[in-house]
Amino acid sequence: MYNDEVKFSLWCDFIERDFLGGEFVNLIQNGVISGVTSNPAIFKSAFTTSEVYKETIKNSGLKYPKAIYERLATQDIKIAATKLFKNYANGDDGFVSIEVDPTLSDDAAATTDEGVRLYGEIAMPNVMIKIPATKAGFEAMSALTSRGINVNATLIFSPEQAMGCLDAFEEGCAAYAKKFPQTPLPKSVISIFVSRFDRLLDERLRQSSLPTGQVGIMNAAKIYNLIEDKNLPSVRALFASTGVKGGDLRPDYYVRELMYKNAVNTAPLDTVKEFIKERAEPKNAPSAENINSFFEVIKRAGIDMNAVYKELMNDGLKAFEVAFNEILRAL
């Protein structure tokens, strides 16, 4: 873990074959990162811009684009999982996430089946199957957890989504523990998206003469507190979408501000590099009272957070589907 004192972990939200063979190993060995996450947008960039994949595609013998995509993705995930296995074996995270086909986000059975299949194909115990936090996704999370499969619940914007994930993991872990009482529970993370709130709302807040760059942090803190209060032993809060795109914020702002006890932060590679340049101190999450007061001000500014949650979730699902379909067209 990046900070053992408060059990704060830093993971890298990036995966690419050349990176896995060099810089990735150095970051692990130096104790900077202890996990890695991926998504269709990350794989799209890697598969369509890096020369290293062309030979694999040429020699794959596979006809269908999705089969080629899965071959490339599972190879990268397995390489990463192998390099992180020592961390995993020592109880120091070591997890690697791969997302199911995002076009299945409303189909619980298909999501579950694909998660089981991908987990089996990669055949590494430190793989997490990444599932969007939709209603169908909650069912799949419970089903996979009950089978002993680690899950990364993704695209969490609202407290209600987080509670759905917590209920699913609690149910799945209970079913698994009943079948295998002497076996450790599968691990899960609830990925709370952060920076997208500020990119969406900051201009409106400026027009109301309100501080910017805070909605994402306060919303993340609210959900983090829910997760910590639930106190499920195998579930942690993970902060995602923590890169800064333009504006006046320092590049590692969302990592430094969310360096909470027992939390994970997955950040783009450039953000990770920026973060380790200067020592960072752990922080305490704001109290429920302070968070509620903050969102009362936001409400008075005419911002409907429920509408914001819905917009960001729809945009997130669409972005992953677009990236996934663009990969398939390119392959």
Identify the meaning behind each predicted range.
Residues 39, 98, 129, 144, ...:
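Conserved, mostly hydrophobic/aromatic
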Residues 21, 107-113, 131-145, 158-169:
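Active-site-adjacent beta->alpha loops and helix N-cap segments on the catalytic face
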Residues 233-330:
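Flexible, acidic glycine-rich loops studded with aromatic residues
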